[in-house]
A protein has these predicted regions:
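C-terminal structural segments of small proteins and small subunits
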Residues: 68-101
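Short, conserved beta-strand segments within well-ordered enzyme catalytic domains
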Residues: 23, 44, 75-78
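Active-site rim helix/loop that mediates acceptor-substrate recognition in acyltransferases
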Residues: 2-19
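Conserved acetyl-CoA-binding loop-helix of GNAT-fold acetyltransferases
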Residues: 55-67
Length: 101
């Protein structure tokens, strides 16, 4: 099966005092969502949902929240299995990670 990458997808980050979500859009269509929570200086990636598969939605969502964490000086705890795999594939960000031990 051939996958199609859509490079012009956009993300929007919405935050509250306890966490928030990253929404991914392909034009006006919502194609993915990532839920996260805050615990002190740690951002926990709790769930990643891709409503369209094979176009890079999950990677876009985790990349966006990773950039947000870096910009805010936060550490990251990838609770979501997709986010854990993303960080394994992007070892340049290993210093951001905290474990759930």
């Amino acid at each position: 099966m051939e996958s199609t990458f859509v490079p012009d997808m956009e993300t929007k980050i919405e935050t509250t005092n306890t966490g928030g979500k990253v929404l991914a859009y392909d034009g006006d269509e919502l194609v993915g969502r990532l839920d996260f929570s805050f615990k002190e200086n740690v951002l926990s990636i709790d769930h990643t949902y891709a409503y369209k598969e094979g176009i890079g939605v999950g990677s876009l969502l985790v990349s966006a929240i990773n950039d947000y964490a870096v910009s805010k000086g936060l550490r990251v705890m990838p609770v979501c299995s997709y986010a854990s795999v993303w960080y394994e594939r992007h070892p340049q960000f290993k210093d951001l990670l905290v474990t759930n031990d």
